[in-house]
């Protein structure tokens, strides 16, 4: 299994939640190899910082969704800044 880890800075909370609900979560959960996913945020320095971890059955499937998330973020620069996207091998779970 592989995890897609995404870090963002959120500028527009309402619009970001709308994007999560309408595009990001449905797109990830409907993607080939999807296992589970968690999207989180916290407030730090006046802006919200988001972190998600989405688990897939393979590195290839995780990378494909990472590419889609990059495209969504590129279309919404006023709402969210993509700070990082990486794929990691899952080495343990509970």
Model-derived regions, located:
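Conserved hydrophobic residues forming the short capping helix/wall of the S-adenosyl-L-methionine
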Residues: 73
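Short S/T/G/P-rich N-terminal loop/turn motif that feeds into the first structured element of a domain
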Residues: 1-51, 57-68, 78-94
């Amino acid at each position: 299994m592989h995890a897609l880890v995404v870090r963002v800075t959120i500028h527009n909370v309402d619009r970001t939640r709308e994007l999560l609900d309408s595009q990001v979560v449905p797109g990830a959960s409907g993607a080939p190899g999807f296992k589970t996913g968690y999207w989180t945020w916290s407030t730090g320095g006046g802006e919200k910082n988001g972190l998600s971890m989405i688990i897939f059955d393979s590195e290839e499937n995780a990378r494909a969704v990472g590419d889609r998330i990059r495209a969504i973020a590129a279309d919404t620069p006023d709402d969210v800044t993509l700070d990082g996207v990486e794929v990691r091998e899952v080495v343990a779970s509970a």
